[in-house]
Amino acid sequence: MSNRNKNILDKIGALIPGYTGYSNRADKRKSEKKFRDQNALLLEKSEKNIIEFQKILISSNDLNKLNEWEDLRKQLNTMTSLVKYSNYGESSFFSENQIKEDELDKVLLFDEEIVDRIQIIFKASENKLSEELTKILISNCLKEIDRILSNRSDFIKEFK
């Protein structure tokens, strides 16, 4: 968009109550989507790391461990979809319950908690920690992310 168009929009926006807030919310929503897409990508990379470890288990014919890791990989795959496709921090334009900027900031705080757990999962899948510790760490983080996503979704539903 050219500077001329921005200036026109800014001038028009100055005449419309709440325009700036709406613009900021739109920017935050775009950031939120990008943020979640990046985190989903980290989870996908973590899953690929687990798949590489599973190949080692297959070559050593350790089917019991392979099944345990497959369960964890499936949980990770499901969580990737939940993170990627979770509710946006938005409400419809004409809804009686519009999400305000400070409430949208709370949604972003949920996202920050999620990213902390995702980074732990990625580092655990990438590092050569003990196998049992890695499984426990990833499993616990997945449970925490599920809880946070549920709380986040409940919070957003208040404004739909």
Q: Locations of the language-model features?
A:
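Leu/Val/Ala/Ile-rich N-terminal alpha-helices, chiefly Sec-type signal peptides and the beginnings
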Residues: 1-58
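Generic signature of intrinsically disordered, low-complexity segments enriched in small/polar residues
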Residues: 22-25, 38, 97, 113, ...
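Short acidic DE-rich linear segments
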Residues: 2-3, 148-160
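Charged linear interaction tracts used for macromolecular binding and regulation
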Residues: 49-143, 147
